[in-house]
């Protein structure tokens, strides 16, 4: 079934009409030219990423330039598997987080009724510290009950023997081995970003390694995928740009455009709020404080630097230069199309939180 699905997906991308009209702001989709532009920006800003070509001319797609068929980064570390204890609270339901990149707290009022445009934050739904304090309080309040059901006096801490005063039985000590499963905990991944012509969005493929010379069996890659995404959003597919059958985990792009559109809208709203605050400032120093305090989505793509006042702006409030700055602010957007893949990787990291995507974005 997977072979048939991979084949149909590949031919659907190759035969779909190529769009040359930019609808980036309205739909979250990008054209092949915009994908190349965003890829060039990613490679420039983060040199761990690079462009790559298909393994043979027959595997190339016509709507992307030779040598720029896909993006690749290698040796991305993944230190832990996504078991029940990942991110702290075992057994918690995954929480839909709609405002992760806009600096929200993920509480009530931030989760919309349609979860398609959201993404998952694992194990963060409760205050683990508060639960721990309550549990300790219950442990401390241990009393005896007599036959009549009356509570006895609470034991004082002094009555409890100190475990450090007891001698350890060497034969009873269970020593933890370095590797109880027989499988090294550290894995590395090679990440590929391709362009899906049918969905008009990027698509991520992942290929894992147990060591530099030992590929990770494809089914074990699912251990590094958030549970709700396994075999649904993330499936095992053949990589279309390589000869032969090279299985990789792939994040299906069917919802990428709607998620990216949501991120764009939220980033623009955050930027508009910052603009409104700037209009109320009375001095350059006050404006600098507003810019430094602002976080959110626009901060991910160096918008703070673009918005900051340069040393050449020394005009007093009300001067021509100050008014020109405010006019320039009105023309800016939070996320430019060439910055698309930077935000895309931040979003896609929620599918594989154990893989250190930020490693690929170090300068």
Curated annotation (Swiss-Prot):
Q: Where in the cell is it found?
A: Cytoplasm
Give residue spans, biased composition: Basic and acidic residues.
128-146
Entries under InterPro entries matching the protein? Atg3/Atg10 (IPR007135)
Where is the catalytic site? 254
Similarity comment:
Belongs to the ATG3 family.
Which PANTHER family does this chain map to?
A: UBIQUITIN-LIKE-CONJUGATING ENZYME ATG3
Q: What name is this protein filed under?
A: Autophagy-related protein 3
For this protein's source organism, the top of the classification is:
Eukaryota, Fungi, Dikarya, Ascomycota, Pezizomycotina
